[in-house]
């Protein structure tokens, strides 16, 4: 699964536990760099190069390398990469890429040591993986060192909002992460920009990773993104496709939608929650059941029974619902 960032699983889990145990959702802002800054981190090598081939499984070899930042000049480099990067790389294509040759020492996190498996393609919010086609606008944006003059003003805000309309899913995610992580951009958001962001999250023809980042920003930064996202969250639960697979591409988007509704105390039609009970993702199913319990506790058990009666119910979902029903009945016995 293509995660939009390395911090998102921890962020979602913290919000998830708050939701499941009926706590108010107040998620601390994660400390993550804007993607352009991440490319220029002191432990990152930034370069432009041409993809050649895959010499070994999960590796990419680049030639005609031009190192821009962080490393010594070289003619070629081989980096370890995830499945997404392996699918994306096209022989003969010129790329902007970033990798890390060191990692935190197992003995002490304050020291850096060489990676035993060799250079690793960077994975960071908005550049996950850090492998983008070297088009003129991409080179101009990424191969210049970050500066407040270039990236903190209205021009970069306009560029980021326009980038969400790109046909390239990677650029959508990069600019969504810029809006998420660059505080100077968040502070400039007005009514018009917020309206455009709400519309973007609802567009199913946009990259789900980018939509998830914007919605999570709305959950974490309500002062800058506004407190009127509940209608967006409710529409997502009503319209997003339901899958019987355990891993759903839109699961992060939906977790955050549940988080916003819980934060704002918003009630939604039960039928919009019911459609998630029988999905293949246990966390989403449980979030839906807890939302139903908050609104109409008397309907939770009948809806579980209804889902269990479906012959097409996925095995994993059936096991989860049986266990959830057992816990629910035990909880009711204790109350009685």
PLM regions with names:
Residues 164-170, 202-209, 239-252, 278-283, ...:
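Short coil turns that connect the paired helices of HEAT/ARM alpha-solenoid repeats
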Residues 42-65:
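Structural detector for short beta-strands of small beta-barrel domains
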Residues 29-43:
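Short boundary/loop segments of OB/S1/cold-shock single-stranded nucleic-acid-binding domains
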Residues 140-150, 173-187, 209-224, 248-266, ...:
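Structural detector for internal amphipathic alpha-helices that build alpha-solenoid repeat scaffolds
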Residues 12-24:
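Bacterial N-terminal signal peptides
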Residues 152-162, 186-201, 224-243, 266-277, ...:
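Amphipathic alpha-helical scaffolding segments comprising HEAT/armadillo-like alpha-solenoid repeats
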Residues 2-15:
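Bacterial N-terminal signal peptides that target proteins for export
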Residues 80-166, 170-171:
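Extracellular C-terminal loop/segment signatures of secreted glycoproteins
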């Amino acid at each position: 699964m293509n995660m939009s960032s390395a911090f998102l699983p921890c962020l979602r889990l913290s919000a998830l536990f708050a939701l499941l145990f009926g706590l108010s959702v107040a998620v601390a802002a994660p400390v993550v760099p804007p993607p352009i800054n991440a490319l220029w981190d002191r432990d990152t090598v930034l370069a432009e190069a041409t993809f050649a081939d895959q010499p070994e499984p999960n590796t990419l070899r680049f030639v005609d390398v031009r190192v821009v930042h962080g490393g010594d000049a070289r003619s070629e480099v081989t980096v370890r990469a995830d499945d997404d990067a392996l699918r994306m790389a096209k022989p003969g294509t010129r790329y902007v890429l970033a990798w890390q040759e060191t990692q935190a020492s197992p003995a002490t996190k304050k020291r850096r040591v060489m990676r035993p498996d060799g250079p690793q393609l960077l994975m960071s919010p908005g550049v996950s993986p850090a492998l983008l086609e070297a088009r003129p606008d991409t080179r101009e944006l990424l191969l210049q060192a970050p500066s407040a003059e270039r990236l903190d003003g209205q021009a970069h805000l306009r560029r980021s909002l326009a980038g969400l309309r790109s046909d390239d899913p990677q650029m959508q995610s990069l600019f969504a992460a810029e809006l998420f992580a660059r505080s100077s951009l968040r502070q400039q958001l007005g009514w018009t920009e917020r309206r455009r962001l709400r519309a973007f999250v609802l567009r199913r023809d946009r990259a789900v990773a980018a939509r998830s980042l914007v919605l999570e920003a709305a959950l974490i930064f309500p002062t800058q993104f506004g407190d009127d996202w509940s209608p967006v969250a409710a529409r997502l639960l009503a319209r997003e496709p339901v899958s019987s697979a355990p891993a759903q591409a839109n699961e992060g988007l939906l977790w955050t939608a549940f988080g916003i509704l819980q934060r704002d105390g918003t009630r939604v039609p039960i039928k919009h929650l019911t459609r998630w009970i029988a999905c293949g993702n246990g966390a989403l199913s449980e979030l839906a059941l807890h939302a139903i319990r908050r609104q109409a506790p008397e309907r939770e058990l009948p809806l579980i029974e209804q889902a269990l009666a479906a012959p097409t119910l996925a095995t994993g979902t059936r096991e989860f619902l049986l266990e959830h029903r057992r816990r629910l009945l035990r909880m009711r016995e204790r109350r009685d």
